Structure formats: C-alpha cells, structure tokens
Amino acid sequence: MTASDPSVLSKPATGDTSFVVVIPARYQSSRLPGKVLADIDGKPMIQWVVEKAQLSGARQVIVATDNDEVAAVVNSFGAEVCKTRADHQSGTERLAEVMEKYQFSDDEIIVNVQGDEPFIPPDNIAQVANNLANQQQSSHVARMSTLAINIDSVDEAFNPNAVKVILDKDGYALYFSRATIPYDRERFLNSDATTEENIRAIGDFYLRHVGIYAYRAGFIKDYVNWPTSELEQVEALEQLRVLYQGERIHVAVANSHVPVEGVDTPEDLAKARAYATSLV
C-alpha cells in the first residue's frame, strides 16, 4: 500500500463501534478461478483486502476459506485464517460456520468484506459497521446494512455484473438486481436512450451495490436457517433472501470513492493491476 492510494487511510479509521471483519475467500470462481490469489503489483489480491480491513478499526480480521493454498498464503503474511467446509453456497453461509467456531455473541457486529475487493476503502468498512450500530436508534430497524455508489456511465448501468439497488425514501433497499433498474420507459424506448446524457439525467436513482455487509452474529444464524428464495436463485444474489423474508436492509452511499470495484473477470483484474501500478 502507498500513501497516494486514495482508498488507504494514513491511520486506522476511528469510531465507537466495535466490530469484526470476516473475509470469505473462495478459490473456485466460474469467471476467474483462483482470483483471490491473483498477483496485483507483487501481492496476492487477498493480502490487499486484508490490509484494507486492518486499517478499518476492526478489533479482529479473519479470512474464511475452504482452500489449503489460500490458507497457506494468508498465513504467510501473518493474517488470521479460519478453515471452513467446501459446501457453502454463499459467503454468508461461510460466515455462519465462522460464527459457530469462534462462538461470537449474538450482538457482535460482523462485517463481511468480499475477498475480491482489493481497493475497498477502510473508511467504508467502518461506515457500514457504524450504520448498523445506529439502527438501534432508528424507528425502522434493519438487521443488515450495506453500501452503494452512484452510477454515471452507460456501460455500468447496463452491465449485469454491476448489481443495481433501488431504495425507499428512508434509505432501505426495495430490490437488488442485475437488470437496469429503475427502467426509464420514456428514455430507454428512444433510439438514443443509452447516451451518457440520458443516464446522468436519471440523477441519483442509479446506484451500484457495493458488496460489503454488516450484521450481528445472531442475524447470520437466522439467515442460514431460511430457505433459499427463487429470487435469490434467479438473480444469484444472496441478499435477496433477506428481502424475501420481509427483513430490511439499510443502504447508504459510500463515504469514500471506490477506485476499482470487485474483481470478477479477467478484464476487472487487468483494471486492478493497472490501478495498482499507477500508484506512486
């Protein structure tokens, strides 16, 4: 990490909220196998993620993986590893096994940071934990919190790998989708619908979900006992299980700019490597 990286704080983020970061790190990936170990400017991707998490103010950072090679690499740079089973269907299910092994109290705030987010700002990790803690004082209590960023490009708005989220007036998720939501009928039915000008005219309606979650350990136990919903299966989005159960998810616009979003494809990895080498 270098001081010129805008996603890095010079010192750990501060705040009154106590939380634990768990980073699910699965080796297998249909679009980019072994991506968590992919080299980015001399370091494996998972090390970038761990170092960001360590700057967030978390009291503990744990990498959860079912893969021996990933575990060995994480151990090699001195981070904490929890070996998990290989049959989990989602990162949240992997977290549930970590909760069981570590016997965290039901009130412990757990932040799920994806293992393919090498440039996630530490400030955003602290933000999502604080947002969940503040739900205790809210009249609309959500047991899960996440973040989003504004979309201002045509490619991103219509990219199924960029998950969109729409919110109600109080900042709670109405729906997450890989589709372009909301769909502006008047603009998009026109031949010039997908111009930059038209996308920007939507204003702040277009939000891209950032794959980071905060929840209490007790909520994770509830989550894994709920059946998988059809919406979750169709969209391949684990957070839809929560909405299907009638639970709220609090969504806030991230405090800090995310310079490079999650690495899902070889093209994403190339962007991440280019960004890392651009840092002075």
UniProtKB/Swiss-Prot annotation:
Cysteine pairings via disulfide bonds: none
Q: Which reaction does it catalyse?
A: 3-deoxy-alpha-D-manno-oct-2-ulosonate + CTP = CMP-3-deoxy-beta-D-manno-octulosonate + diphosphate
A Gene Ontology molecular function term for this protein is: 3-deoxy-manno-octulosonate cytidylyltransferase activity
**What pathway, per the record?**
Nucleotide-sugar biosynthesis; CMP-3-deoxy-D-manno-octulosonate biosynthesis; CMP-3-deoxy-D-manno-octulosonate from 3-deoxy-D-manno-octulosonate and CTP: step 1/1; Bacterial outer membrane biogenesis; lipopolysaccharide biosynthesis
Query: What GO cellular component term, any one, is given?
Result: cytosol
Specify whether RNA-binding is a keyword of the entry: no
Query: Which Enzyme Commission numbers does its entry carry?
Result: 2.7.7.38
- Superkingdom classification of source: Bacteria
A UniProt-annotated Pfam family: CTP_transf_3
**Record bears the keyword Cytoplasm:** yes
- Where primarily located? cytoplasm
**Where does the record say this protein resides?**
Cytoplasm
Q: Which InterPro entries match?
A: Cytidylyl_trans (IPR003329), KdsB (IPR004528), Nucleotide-diphossugar_trans (IPR029044)
Q: Which Gene3D superfamilies match?
A: Spore Coat Polysaccharide Biosynthesis Protein SpsA, Chain A
Q: Which UniProt keywords apply?
A: Cytoplasm, Lipopolysaccharide biosynthesis, Nucleotidyltransferase, Transferase
Per the record, the GO terms for biological process are: CMP-keto-3-deoxy-D-manno-octulosonic acid biosynthetic process; lipopolysaccharide biosynthetic process
The record's comment on protein family reads: Belongs to the KdsB family.
Task: Summarize the protein's role.
Answer: Activates KDO (a required 8-carbon sugar) for incorporation into bacterial lipopolysaccharide in Gram-negative bacteria.
Q: Which HAMAP family match?
A: KdsB (MF_00057)
From the Swiss-Prot or TrEMBL record, give the protein name.
3-deoxy-manno-octulosonate cytidylyltransferase
Q: Which organism is it from?
A: Colwellia psychrerythraea (strain 34H / ATCC BAA-681) (Vibrio psychroerythus)
The gene from which this protein is expressed is kdsB
